């Protein structure tokens, strides 16, 4: 451990210990990240471009027909003020459409921070980098559902 003779020394030690977020880009200039939500897992690649978003080989508006799901997917891009600056390619599997949209959103957020580490603070504040850990509660025996009991008859 470093020798701490004053509070000023403490600041230099803590700065050195904090991990610096480094730009992670492959040989093709893309950043890769995985996003998860419920049972859906998305693999996302982000690269500079015109703003085209492709999900499982289809245009994102075609894959996610509901406007709410399209809005969920675009949230991190709009929050980072990078609308129309990145091409996004995602493959997503598992779960339903809502979980898949959340998984792609999580993956896009992580990939944006890998590509441009300066966006991390904005996306973290918006809650886009946090994995939403809520999943369906399992059904218990002796119950109709996870918590709902069978109908009770007094007589």
From Swiss-Prot:
Any one of the GO CC terms: cytosolic small ribosomal subunit
InterPro entries: Ribosomal_Su5_D2-typ_SF, Ribosomal_uS9, Ribosomal_uS9_bac/plastid, Ribosomal_uS9_CS, Ribsml_uS5_D2-typ_fold_subgr
A GO biological-process term: translation
Keyword annotations of the record: Ribonucleoprotein, Ribosomal protein
Disulfide bond positions: none
Taxonomic lineage of the native organism: Bacteria, Pseudomonadati, Pseudomonadota, Alphaproteobacteria, Hyphomicrobiales
Pfam families documented for this protein: Ribosomal_S9
Any one GO molecular-function label of the UniProt entry: RNA binding
Family: Belongs to the universal ribosomal protein uS9 family.
Xref: PANTHER family: RIBOSOMAL PROTEIN S9, SMALL RIBOSOMAL SUBUNIT PROTEIN US9M
NCBIfam families recorded: PRK00132.1
Name of this protein: Small ribosomal subunit protein uS9
Organism: Rhizobium johnstonii (strain DSM 114642 / LMG 32736 / 3841)
Gene coding for it: rpsI
